[in-house]
């Protein structure tokens, strides 16, 4: 399994636009990317203006497939418009145990 956890500081007044984009990205992943196992958008109550993105893929090849789709190609454009800062990008490269293990 391959994945990442990303912390996004959202620009003031841009939360709805960012969430619309991330929901679209999740819909595309669900409809067209069988190797995308998780594409979750979270918020932590005590951190207003912060969104967490958790992604889990079958393997690196599945992430590479995700990167070929339209939402991924628009990431930089959306980031410029809606994100103050992207921090704590934590690559998760080797799953040690998972409920998805076969």
Predicted regions and their residues:
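Short, well-ordered beta-strand segments in beta-rich or mixed alpha/beta enzyme
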Residues: 2-9, 38-67
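Glycine-rich beta-strand-turn "strand-cap" elements at beta-sheet edges
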Residues: 40-49, 76-102
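Short alpha-helical
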Residues: 13, 24, 46-48, 70
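N-terminal first-folded block
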Residues: 2-32, 36-37
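An amphipathic, aromatic/His-enriched active-site/gating alpha helix that lines ligand/cofactor pockets
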Residues: 24-36, 56-90
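Generic "edge-of-domain/loop-turn" microfeature
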Residues: 13-15, 46, 62, 96-97
């Amino acid at each position: 399994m391959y994945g990442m956890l990303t912390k996004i500081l959202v620009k003031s007044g841009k939360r709805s636009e960012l969430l619309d984009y991330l929901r679209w990205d999740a819909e595309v992943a669900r409809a067209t990317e069988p190797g995308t196992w998780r594409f979750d958008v979270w918020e932590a109550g005590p951190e207003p203006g912060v969104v967490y993105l958790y992604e889990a893929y079958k393997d690196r090849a599945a992430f590479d497939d995700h990167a070929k789709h339209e939402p991924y190609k628009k990431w930089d454009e959306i980031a410029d418009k809606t994100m103050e800062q992207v921090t704590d990008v934590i690559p998760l490269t080797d799953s040690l145990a998972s409920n998805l293990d076969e």
